[in-house]
Amino acid sequence: MCVCAIPFFEFFLPFIPHYAFLLFVSSVRFTVNERCYYLVCVLKLNCAFFFMVMIFELKRVCVSYLDRSRKIQIVSFFPFITIIFFHS
């Protein structure tokens, strides 16, 4: 298991399994139609690196936004870290 994140936040992460993804909320924040959004970078922790960028609205329930197949669990340490677990 590899747990490598921003060193400042490593004390949050002793429980992350090998299939976890980390979301780093970047410093980029912007507003569209009076709604605030963060730019989020996703980094896969195991095996090859996987990187993508996505947008989600603040204060919206992220589980209802992402979990349509009920295979995704989201744990959020807002505004620092959000962890997404993909269950097979």
From Swiss-Prot:
Transmembrane segments: 5-25, 36-56
One GO CC annotation: membrane
Major site of localization recorded for this protein: membrane
Natural source organism: Saccharomyces cerevisiae (strain ATCC 204508 / S288c) (Baker's yeast)
Cellular compartment(s): Membrane
Name of this chain's protein: Uncharacterized protein YCR024C-B
Annotated membrane topology: Multi-pass membrane protein
Key words of the record: Membrane, Transmembrane, Transmembrane helix
